[in-house]
Amino acid sequence: MPVWSWVAGWILAVAETTELLPEAKAGEGDLLAKILESNLINIAIILTLLFILGRKVVGEALAKRREGILEELRQAEQRKREAIERLAEEQQKLAQAQQEAERIRKQAEANAEARRQELLEQAEREVERLRANAEKELSSEQERVFQELRRQIVRQALSKVEQELPQHLNEEVHRSLIEKGIQMIAR
């Protein structure tokens, strides 16, 4: 109701202003005043209708827009919270991944060190084995050389004895030598 009272007051004010207009020539003033008065009344009615109807439409549009903005703000806040949660989760995953990478790196270093030690020990064992084989082969070769030298010395000695023996050999010496030879072989 307050709107109608305001509209009625406004229409009365417009009507009063038309009476205050100076009249033009006789006959024209009445017509001009009536046209002006009817135009002002029409404008007042149109403005009132626009105000009443427009206020409702504009109010509804503004309310809808306000609700839309509030909903968008709520959604933005929700997305922000979700993004913060995802960021925290991803940061936690990153920290875990970094810890896992550090653990893997340390494990790899430990494995590499263990493998290096194993290879060094294996190399030392191989060197020792080769050294022992070399010493064994050297000893075996020395023994073979000594045996060969003994054989050659014995052959040479026998050859020399065979050459000189017939000149110094008699029956008794011959038997004595055979017995000594048998005894030497028997040992």
Curated annotation (Swiss-Prot):
Membrane protein topology class: Single-pass membrane protein
InterPro entries: ATP_synth_B-like_membr_sf, ATP_synth_b/b'su_bac/chlpt
Subcellular location, record wording: Cellular thylakoid membrane
Database matches in CDD domains: ATP-synt_Fo_b
Molecular functions per Gene Ontology: proton-transporting ATP synthase activity, rotational mechanism
Keyword terms of this UniProt record: ATP synthesis, CF(0), Hydrogen ion transport, Ion transport, Membrane, Thylakoid, Transmembrane, Transmembrane helix, Transport
Principal subcellular localization: membrane
A Pfam short name: ATP-synt_B
Membrane spanning residue stretches: 32-52
GO cellular component annotations of the record: plasma membrane-derived thylakoid membrane; proton-transporting ATP synthase complex
Function of the protein: F(1)F(0) ATP synthase produces ATP from ADP in the presence of a proton or sodium gradient. F-type ATPases consist of two structural domains, F(1) containing the extramembraneous catalytic core and F(0) containing the membrane proton channel, linked together by a central stalk and a peripheral stalk. During catalysis, ATP synthesis in the catalytic domain of F(1) is coupled via a rotary mechanism of the central stalk subunits to proton translocation. Component of the F(0) channel, it forms part of the peripheral stalk, linking F(1) to F(0).
Entries under NCBIfam families matching the protein: PRK07352.1
Entry similarity comment: Belongs to the ATPase B chain family.
Subunit structure: F-type ATPases have 2 components, F(1) - the catalytic core - and F(0) - the membrane proton channel. F(1) has five subunits: alpha(3), beta(3), gamma(1), delta(1), epsilon(1). F(0) has four main subunits: a(1), b(1), b'(1) and c(10-14). The alpha and beta chains form an alternating ring which encloses part of the gamma chain. F(1) is attached to F(0) by a central stalk formed by the gamma and epsilon chains, while a peripheral stalk is formed by the delta, b and b' chains.
HAMAP family, A to Z: ATP_synth_b_bprime
Name of the protein: ATP synthase subunit b
